[in-house]
Amino acid sequence: MHTHASRPHARQSALPRRAALFDFPASADLSPDTGAARQHTIQWLSRFRVFENHASVEEYDALRFDVLTGLFYPRATGADLNLGSDLVGWYFVFDDQFDGELGCRPEEVARLVADVIRVTEEDMAPGGTGGGEGPLLESFRDLWHRINSGRPRVWRDRFRHHWLEYLHSYHREALERTGAAPADGGGDAPRSVEDVLALRRHSIGVQPCLDLNEPFGGYTLPSALHGGFPLARMREATDDVVVFTNDIASLDKELAVGDVHNSVIVQWKLAGGGVEDAVRHIAGLANARYGWFEETAARLPELLAEAGADPGTHRAVGRYVDGMRHVMTGNLGWSLRTARYDERGTEAVSGGRERPWARLTGAEDLIRAGRGAPPPPGSGPDTRQPMPSEPSQLA
């Protein structure tokens, strides 16, 4: 691939220029308790020994996940925002575990995913918790119990389903990364942007974040409404907008580390031409999704009235739609403010460097102890070939 996208000067100017391609706003609507949530989550992760020293804390803090949370939930305050901030912080700490050797070890990834899933199956009663498994699982157990405590069963089942989809996506990514599983196109078919979306809609972790809008807003959507048209399709559009935004924002970082689970990179490989052509194409797909979302949101009151929805349902759906909108515009707003995607973020993971909190699972010790080094990225069969089709437009 071309190398000019990795040069420092290009990195400094590329993201704002690329973000200007989006037709939707970059939110600046922050919860007033964002600063307090920032301190809370750093203390919470520190309590579970996620950070090895002060330098690790400073590196984490520069990524400003508190801002992402405050933009996702601008009306949440206090304990609710702290809970959302802990969820977002844990997400990214977990995600960073797979940037090194572990991400190329599907069997080890499957074991880790199974360990996390077991926590979701534990007794929620006091005293029904384990311990001693290390920072990642212990912090997740605390988070899981706090999120689910006192919630309605229908909500807890939905939330867990979305979590399982999220967790299993890491194993699938590891299989694809090592060539152990073909891309969804199969055979010799080229890999497409739609193939990337099929996996990234889960690995992006948007659905559990959307789920929190319900307890934070004091309502629970009925399953038929949540899973029916048009909300299910609006949630998918939200997934796609966040994926496309993230893939454009993180492009230089992922080019630097050789990650292939990026719609821009796949489109570039499929269509040829310059990388900025691929960026414009993906931005266009994001704009189409967002445009469809807003058109559908404008029709929702009429659709709900035709269905005989009561005023409480109208209010709940309106809040949920606002929550989806906050996630899309907030993700873009944060992407322009975080150090994760600027030149500092790219340099922080270049040359094989990992984040200081990237080895919390113990899997790397097992690998070094006798299971051999993982195959280098790209050494297996090429799984990055796209299919000759584009994702269908939401219309």
Curated annotation (Swiss-Prot):
Mg(2+) 1 binds at residue 95. Its EC number is 4.2.3.157. It comes from Streptomyces malaysiensis. It comes from the Bacteria. It is an enzyme of class 4 (lyase). Catalyzes the cyclization of farnesyl diphosphate (FPP) to isoafricanol. Mg(2+) 3 binds at residues 246, 250, 254. The keyword Cytoplasm does not apply. Binds 3 Mg(2+) ions per subunit. Residues 346-395 are annotated as: Disordered. The lineage of its organism: Bacteria, Bacillati, Actinomycetota, Actinomycetes, Kitasatosporales. Keywords: Lyase, Magnesium, Metal-binding. This is Isoafricanol synthase.
